[in-house]
UniProtKB/Swiss-Prot annotation:
This is Beta-toxin Tz1. Negative results: does not affect the cardiac Nav1.5/SCN5A, the peripheral nerve channel Nav1.7/SCN9A, and the voltage-dependent potassium channel Kv1.5/KCNA5. GO terms for cellular component: extracellular region. Disulfide bonds join C31-C82, C35-C57, C43-C63, C47-C65. It comes from Tityus zulianus. The lineage of its organism: Eukaryota, Metazoa, Ecdysozoa, Arthropoda, Chelicerata. Beta toxins bind voltage-independently at site-4 of sodium channels (Nav) and shift the voltage of activation toward more negative potentials thereby affecting sodium channel activation and promoting spontaneous and repetitive firing. Strongly affects skeletal muscle channels Nav1.4/SCN4A, poorly affects the neuronal channels Nav1.6/SCN8A and Nav1.2/SCN2A. Induces spastic paralysis of rear limbs, increased salivation, apnea, tachycardia and increased perspiration. GO terms for biological process: defense response. Expressed by the venom gland. The keyword Hydrolase does not apply. Coiled coil: none annotated.
Amino acid sequence: MTRFVLFICCFFLIGMVVECKDGYLVGNDGCKYSCFTRPGTYCANECSRVKGKDGYCYAWMACYCYSMPNWVKTWDRATNRCGRGK
């Protein structure tokens, strides 16, 4: 029983340390990375460049990435500044 409790505790600690996020990649201008006219592997390559596990061109024609580190900027409706002055 003690080993089981220890295993569960370690499992939660690992989960807290290895935090990843999913979302749309954002450029310096605050806009999502467009993939409308890009090759099929463009988003997967861009996502791997920022240490994401995988990515694809979503219906909004923007790159969506999975399992990226927390330091990567992602698009958020609340903080959207695309098309606005800096």
